[in-house]
Amino acid sequence: MATLRKNPFTPTFGHASFAFAGRDEFIDDVIEELANQPGDPNRSTIFLGPRGAGKTVLMNAIAREASSMGWTNANAVARHGLLEDLMFALKTNSAHILGEQSPPQLTSIKVGPVGASRESPQESVPWRFRFQQIIEELNCQGVGVLFTIDEVNPECKELIDFISLFQLFVSEGRDVAMLLAGLPNMVSTLLESNYVSFVRRAFQLHLSTIPDEDIKDTFLSTITENERTIIAQSGL
């Protein structure tokens, strides 16, 4: 029985695409910026564009490329619980480097009715120092940390908090980078906040309409790479 090949033109939903029409230059630009020295403002990048412009897919592609260059990624969506999500992702994605984390500790016990409670040994430690500890351990092993945050929401207090933390990490010379992605109006409102003036210096990439010629070239290369032919190129 013949095996059906996966259609390379099937739309994706935030995961890896077969090709990036007109977006390769963006990926190259950001990857080049990661090679800059810690503290370079271009290590912070904001992707702006309407829904469906490919912000999430592009950000994920950059994170994968960065991973192959010795970075570890912590990704999350700007919502309640952002800091916890970033911490969990950072620990999970760097577990093969840092090894096993300390187990929860017994912190209290009751006799009547019998009971006990456990908490993480770092639960009472401020977020700044919890992140710093892991970042420092990774940096000491030559591993940079790339934070990627999608769906920028100026109403998300934890996003404001994290940007402030990231500014501290940068000022301390830590090997970190940050990618943000969001709708233009959401990003604009965020940048107007007095609490995130630091990120106004970030490199902004506006994802607009892809040129027709880039779309045509991508169609042709995708068809060729999948061992297919097109009879009338004028139809593209």
Language-model segment annotations:
Residues 67-72, 83-116:
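Conserved NTP-binding/hydrolysis module of P-loop NTPases
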Residues 1-43, 92, 107:
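A short, basic N-terminal segment
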Residues 120-185, 192-195:
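Conserved Walker B catalytic segment
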Residues 207-234:
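Conserved small helical "lid"/interfacial subdomain of P-loop NTPases
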Residues 52, 79-83, 154, 183-188, ...:
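Conserved nucleotide-binding/hydrolysis micro-motifs of P-loop NTPases
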Residues 46, 63-82:
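Conserved catalytic segments around the Walker B and adjacent sensor/switch elements
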Residues 39-61:
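Walker A/P-loop nucleotide-binding motif
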Residues 192-209:
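A short helix-turn-beta junction within AAA+ P-loop NTPase domains corresponding to the substrate/partner-engaging
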